[in-house]
Regions:
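Extracellular glycan-recognition surfaces and repeat-rich motifs
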Residues: 50-80
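Bacterial N-terminal signal peptides that target proteins for export
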Residues: 1-7
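Beta-strand-rich interaction surfaces with strong enrichment in secreted/lumenal proteins
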Residues: 30-32, 91-97, 180-186, 228-229
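Extracellular carbohydrate-recognition regions
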Residues: 22-58, 251
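Short, solvent-exposed beta-strand-to-loop segments that form ligand-recognition rims
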Residues: 208-227
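Secretory/extracellular carbohydrate-interaction modules
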Residues: 75-165
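Short, aromatic/His-centered strand-loop micro-motif at the edge of beta-sheets
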Residues: 155-193
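Short tryptophan-centered beta-strand motifs in secreted/extracellular beta-sheet-rich domains
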Residues: 45, 105-107, 189-199, 203-205
């Protein structure tokens, strides 16, 4: 009996099953979802005195040569010892105290060894998610990731359930639709203009004016985003000429 056709058919069925199970990224709107209003903040990092709204969150960021340089220095877990708590590896994070609801954030970015650069939105007074994380748009060398963290990966209820191995199906159901990944390709050493629009429960990312990521999810519509944070994983990532506008839905 020739079993080769059966094996081929089995492989095709298995592949089709996995393809059906893979989450499908949403269609990206071709036009902006947010309409710019007044400019809330601007920094080209060339001034002699840093704006007081910037602040350290996780080391290490510094201004050099008219650029904001981020380097992940908490790059490994350090176990608890001598009465000191465990320290987990974490991307470098720099905070900006500019409250928004709907907004457009634009910055120049460059990879110089970094594996990830992102723009995120938080509400420190919100206790339903870890550290008040609301949403973020991540740029990696091979993809763009859009995240609703309030109702997804940083949601405190979900994080508690993740500790119970019997709750995997429940967690997966709660996480469905809370993130989207889009293939992309970025070059180290090259400057890009990274734009993130937030309008209601929608978030759209663009690189050099071309839309590269989109997500519609309830957590993104969180009414109070008390601050914006810039993140860099790996070594090193640069930001330049950042601007933040208040905005309204373009529709």
């Amino acid at each position: 009996m020739n079993i080769r056709p059966i094996l081929v058919l089995s492989c095709l069925v298995t592949s089709a099953t996995f393809a059906a199970e893979a989450p499908k990224a949403p269609a990206i709107p071709s036009h902006p979802i947010a309409k710019k209003k007044e400019l809330l903040f601007s920094d080209d990092f060339k001034g002699s005195t840093p704006d007081k709204r910037w602040h350290r969150v996780v080391d290490t960021f510094k201004v050099e040569g008219g650029m904001l340089k981020g380097t992940q220095t908490r790059d490994k877990d350090v176990p608890a010892a001598d009465g000191k708590p465990e320290v987990k590896a974490h991307a470098a994070v720099f905070g900006l105290e500019v409250p928004t609801k709907d907004s457009v954030v634009e910055a120049k970015i460059k990879f110089e060894g970094a594996t990830m650069i992102d723009i995120e939105f938080d509400d420190r007074k919100f206790t339903g998610s870890h550290y008040g994380h609301i949403a973020r748009a991540q740029i990696r060398l091979d993809k763009v990731v859009m995240l609703d963290e309030r109702d997804g990966s940083q949601n405190e209820e979900i994080k508690a359930l993740q500790k119970d191995p019997t709750k995997k199906a429940e967690v997966a159901k709660m996480m469905a639709g809370k993130s989207a990944t889009f293939p992309a390709k970025f070059e180290p050493g090259k400057w890009y203009t990274f734009t993130v629009e937030v309008a209601g429960d929608e978030m759209r990312a663009s690189i050099d004016g071309k839309a590269v990521g989109y997500l519609k999810s309830a957590g993104i519509g969180h009414a109070t985003k008390s601050k914006i944070e810039l993140g860099v994983a790996g070594k090193d990532g640069y930001f330049g000429d950042i601007k933040v506008w208040n905005a309204e839905p373009a529709k």
